[in-house]
Design a protein with these regions (language model features):
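Flexible, processing/modification-adjacent segments and terminal tails
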Residues: 20-26, 37-50, 57, 78, ...
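Buried hydrophobic packing residues in well-ordered domains
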Residues: 66, 99-100, 126, 170, ...
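Gly/Pro-enriched, hydrophobic low-complexity segments
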Residues: 146-148, 153, 171-258
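N-terminal leader/targeting segments and the immediate start of mature chains
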Residues: 13-80, 88-94
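A generic structural motif
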Residues: 69-75, 101-103, 121-124, 179-181, ...
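Extended lipid/amphipathic-ligand handling interfaces
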Residues: 55, 85-90, 111-112, 219-225
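One face of beta-strands
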Residues: 64-70, 98-100, 117-119, 189-191, ...
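Sec-dependent N-terminal signal peptides
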Residues: 4-12
């Protein structure tokens, strides 16, 4: 039977699918004694492809239900808003389905390893609209998070390079640079993610606009332990160009056992 799962945008201490293993540089050199700054471009690509595949395959160990709020702080002078949001996630065969429902509509993100992400936006009494990746490069419910951010779209881009390993927040991280096949106006030119090598969760990401300027910064802010596993409780996206910022705060609880 289908099992309800709560995948938060960045999974912490997650299980993996059998098909994915941690990148070679982590398995072969866990203390980063050999691989620190990675100069060899072929190694950058190999480690990057392995890392993106592993992160696509991550799943939480147990089901979690979630409600929460978007706390939206617009550029200076604007009125702050709080938007209630409901989260629902379930597995449909090899596909992971994430739904984010606000009053104005529901975003459904369908993701399977190695396949294009499918985005669907449904408003009340309207036929659901299928969005391509470029169309998903738009704000979700007026927040600084784009729909494509919620789908971790950058992990599916063809160009993935691990360029170095360094400490961040006291944890050894791989620095993953993700670039799309082509840069489109209004989209991203690259995303630089600091990935904790233990949990394989993102501890910081910098997202650059089509002109190569820093646009947004993503950071997880708080975690909660449920059934012995850490889950993301709060995360923030701030716009470096406008000064706006959005926090997503999750109210988490274990899902009822099927």
């Amino acid at each position: 039977s289908m099992r309800a799962l709560m995948i938060l945008i960045v999974a912490a201490l997650a299980d993996r699918l059998d098909a994915a293993v941690k990148p070679d540089h982590i398995l072969q050199d866990p203390q980063a004694r050999v691989f620190q700054t990675i100069v060899d471009v072929e190694l950058q690509k190999r480690f990057g492809a392995q890392m993106a595949l592993y992160m696509q395959a991550m799943r939480p160990a147990n089901a979690v239900n979630g409600n929460g709020v978007l706390r939206i702080r617009p550029p200076r002078g604007g009125k702050r808003r709080t938007v209630p949001v409901e989260f629902r996630t379930f597995a449909l065969g090899p596909t992971l389905v994430n739904q984010y429902a606000v009053e104005e509509g529901t975003l459904t993100v369908r993701a399977a390893v190695g396949k294009d992400t499918q985005y669907e936006w449904a408003t009340p009494n309207q036929k659901p609209e299928q969005l391509d990746v470029e169309q998903a490069m738009q704000s979700f419910a007026g927040a600084d998070f784009w729909m494509a951010d919620l789908g971790l779209e950058m992990l599916r881009w063809p160009n993935q390079n691990v360029i170095e390993r360094r400490l961040r927040r006291g944890e050894l991280c791989s620095v993953l640079v993700s670039r799309p096949a082509k840069v489109t106006e209004g989209g991203y030119s690259k995303v630089v993610s600091w990935v904790d090598e233990d949990s394989m969760g993102i501890v910081r990401a910098e997202l650059f606009d089509a002109q190569g300027k820093l646009l947004k910064i993503f950071e997880p802010k708080a975690f909660k332990k449920i059934d012995g596993q850490w889950h993301l409780k709060e995360m923030e996206m701030r716009n470096d160009q406008t000064g706006s910022r959005t926090a997503i705060v999750f109210e988490l609880k274990p899902a009822p056992k099927p």
